[in-house]
Amino acid sequence: SAKREIANAFLVTDDDIIISDPEAEYSPLVERLGGQVIRVSPTSTQYINPMDINMNYSEEDNPIALKADFILSLCELVVGGKEGLQPIEKTVIDRCVHQVYQSYFNDPRPDNMPVLEDLYDELMKQDEKEAHHVATALEIYVKGSLNLFNHRTNVDIDNRLVCYDIKELGKQLKKIGMLIVQDQVWGRVTANREEGKSTRYYMDEMHLLLREDQTAAYSVEIWKRFRKWGGIP
């Protein structure tokens, strides 16, 4: 079973192990092994920041371009509806993502790490009505009752064994949570690659991320990179 495989990998290898856990079934094992369980829910005070980025985020010289792809996928889940994002919406999101990270990379300290609200504010400054449409759709995730992803990361995501318990996320939030966890895993893979370390990722219900075009394309691309960079799915 997956639990036995995880326990063996933990005891026999030095690999980092990350679990996306939609049914809260891995928490007892992870706690027994001294790992970190992160409960992602609208009522939790444990936060992961979807805007987290590190200098090694992409193998090309431009980590912002790959991060923009992730943010576009996130916005597709939030804004897209059946039609997905429209071309002008994609353009303004991409522009704003570049502006937000440009100012971060000018002074890349942890307390300058952008949050969703920085993207929201940047969208509101744009002239296009499409930018305001996207910002309005994001508002509930920034200032409203679903603002759990509008905080800086405040948990130990560097533990060798991390389990993201997303059971309490509702149907719509679950996909968003899975996408954000996938991005956190990618951040870990890129950091570990620098140290020559492998990263194992266990993920249930992957099919949920393959239903929207942009999100599916992004997820497939990330999984290809993941394997190339020493990830073990």
Regions found by a protein language model. Name each.
Residues 1-42:
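Glycine-rich phosphate-binding loop of nucleotide-binding enzymes
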Residues 24-36, 42-44, 49-231:
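P-loop NTPase motor domains
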